[in-house]
Amino acid sequence: VFFQYAPFDVEGGLKFWGHYTSEDLLDWKYEGTALYPDSSYDCHGVYSGSSLIDQDKMHLFFTGNVKIDGDYDYINEGRETSTLHVESEDGIHFSDKEEVISFEKYPEDFTCHIRDPKVWKENDRYKMVLGGRLKEDKGAVLVYESEDLRDWKLERVITTPEVFGYMWEC
């Protein structure tokens, strides 16, 4: 089980991913911190995401958060969130982080708030959904597709005619 946590701030500061394992779902072993905010893509937090086992490898997809210093609202400008990926053969040691969807490639009608990738395999292709906030303060889901877990193409955006929350996430 991976979980998002802020080990240095009880009010939810800098986010990391912790990791527990279990053989029987009754007894759990803490494996330590799996993902750190240690790259230029996620220096202000490793936000939530999902894992996928495919071809004997574990793939983690998550949101990297970067806040630019300055006088910004951090809704429409001043924040860069990218979808990041690592893989592992043992679930403990992970590859270097790679950016699979950069913040510049998200649709222009969205704010800086796009996050929390959920990835699965469907009919020999991979699907991803991300929660987002439209500039009109309306929540939406972005649906992506990939053949290789690295090159993602936007398929569609899902929302409701009426406002049903200003941000859809997790």
Describe the role of every protein-language-model region:
Residues 1-116, 120-170:
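Beta-rich carbohydrate-recognition and catalytic domains
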